[in-house]
């Protein structure tokens, strides 16, 4: 820790306070995340340190780099590259009545999918994707922050400040208590973020787990074993759920063209194995008119 100096507190993340800092000898500006864990007395579990240290291997232009993992008096500090703006702040800054440029929506979505595909190939899930952990710079680059932290530290119900962790981007299999879930959870979250890029409004903004589920069901229909095999045997599925028909996705996301709506619908398929993968999504016709050679990952993909 003596290599870094804290400049200012910049926010409160899921796991603790986030500071802007600087490396004393190189001058590099960094984000310093102080991890506060539930069991403060026992210190940081070695499994968490091991898990999180593996994340230093994730090097991709659309994934925020974890530069260092440091311990100080049984506190864990994660040192990340610094970006000053997140997607939520950016969307909030767009004046009323105006929307993101459709090509920027397309570019951001493609870059998010690149970052997700890169991590999924390496067996790393995010599990808590939301606009607050998508960071942007002033050159049109978007990067995913906090990849892999959920596995290292769990996804808390409440932030350490007692603010409830948002459910708006959470996949239905997680909300229904599925004990096994995989990479499709991140694709669902990305789909809901895609809709929000287009409309500036969260697609499903529930204020409890049941309200969240019912908002999804009202839009896409209440799932059953016909559309999603074995959904009715998930721990939190109730046969008493109202049977909504759904089918109102296009009326809720008016700013997307036919290809955009088709891709969104494929990202929001209930049955996880049938949901489009990040890799498949990148080849969807929606992206045909995107110049991928200008994107930050072009150099590593050989586009």
Swiss-Prot record:
ATP binds at residues 10-18, 33. The active site is at residue 128. GO terms for biological process: cell division; G2/M transition of mitotic cell cycle; mitotic G2 DNA damage checkpoint signaling. Pfam families: Pkinase (PF00069). Keywords: ATP-binding, Cell cycle, Cell division, Cytoplasm, Cytoskeleton, Kinase, Mitosis, Nucleotide-binding, Nucleus, Phosphoprotein, Serine/threonine-protein kinase, Transferase. InterPro entries: CDK (IPR050108), Kinase-like_dom_sf (IPR011009), Prot_kinase_dom (IPR000719), Protein_kinase_ATP_BS (IPR017441), Ser/Thr_kinase_AS (IPR008271). It catalyses: L-seryl-[protein] + ATP = O-phospho-L-seryl-[protein] + ADP + H(+); L-threonyl-[protein] + ATP = O-phospho-L-threonyl-[protein] + ADP + H(+); [DNA-directed RNA polymerase] + ATP = phospho-[DNA-directed RNA polymerase] + ADP + H(+). It is an enzyme of class 2 (transferase). The modification Phosphotyrosine is found at residue 15. Phosphorylation at Tyr-15 by wee1 and wee2 inhibits the protein kinase activity and acts negative regulator of entry into mitosis (G2 to M transition). Its EC number is 2.7.11.22, 2.7.11.23. Plays a key role in the control of the eukaryotic cell cycle by modulating the centrosome cycle as well as mitotic onset; promotes G2-M transition via association with multiple interphase cyclins. During G2 and early mitosis, CDC25A/B/C-mediated dephosphorylation activates CDK1/cyclin complexes which phosphorylate several substrates that trigger at least centrosome separation, Golgi dynamics, nuclear envelope breakdown and chromosome condensation. Belongs to the protein kinase superfamily. CMGC Ser/Thr protein kinase family. CDC2/CDKX subfamily. This is Cyclin-dependent kinase 1. It comes from Oryzias luzonensis (Luzon ricefish).
């Amino acid at each position: 820790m003596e290599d870094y100096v804290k400049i200012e507190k910049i926010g409160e993340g899921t796991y603790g306070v986030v500071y802007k800092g600087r490396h004393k000898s190189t001058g590099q500006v960094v984000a310093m995340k102080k991890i506060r864990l539930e069991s403060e007395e026992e210190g940081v579990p070695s499994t968490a340190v091991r898990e999180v240290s593996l994340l230093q291997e994730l090097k991709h232009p659309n994934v925020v780099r974890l530069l260092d993992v440091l311990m100080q008096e049984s506190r864990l500090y994660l040192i990340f590259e610094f970006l000053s703006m997140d997607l939520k702040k950016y969307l909030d800054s767009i004046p009323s009545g105006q929307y993101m440029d459709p090509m920027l929506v397309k570019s951001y979505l493609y870059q998010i999918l690149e970052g997700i595909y890169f991590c999924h190939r390496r067996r790393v899930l995010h599990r808590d994707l939301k606009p607050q952990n998508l960071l942007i710079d002033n050159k049109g680059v978007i990067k995913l922050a906090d990849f892999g932290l959920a596995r290292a530290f769990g996804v808390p119900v409440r932030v350490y400040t007692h603010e409830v962790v948002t459910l708006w981007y959470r996949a239905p299999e997680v909300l229904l208590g599925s004990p096994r879930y995989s990479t499709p959870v991140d694709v669902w979250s990305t789909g809901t973020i895609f809709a929000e890029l287009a409309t500036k409004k969260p697609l499903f903004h529930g204020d409890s787990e049941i309200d969240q589920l019912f908002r999804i069901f009202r839009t896409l229909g209440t799932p059953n074993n016909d559309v999603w095999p074995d959904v009715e045997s998930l721990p939190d599925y109730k046969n008493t759920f109202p049977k909504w028909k759904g089918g109102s996705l296009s009326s809720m996301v008016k700013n997307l063209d036919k290809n955009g709506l088709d891709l969104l619908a494929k990202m929001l398929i209930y049955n996880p194995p049938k949901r489009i993968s990040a890799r498949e999504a990148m080849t969807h016709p929606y992206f045909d008119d995107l110049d991928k050679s200008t994107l930050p990952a072009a150099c590593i993909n050989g586009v």
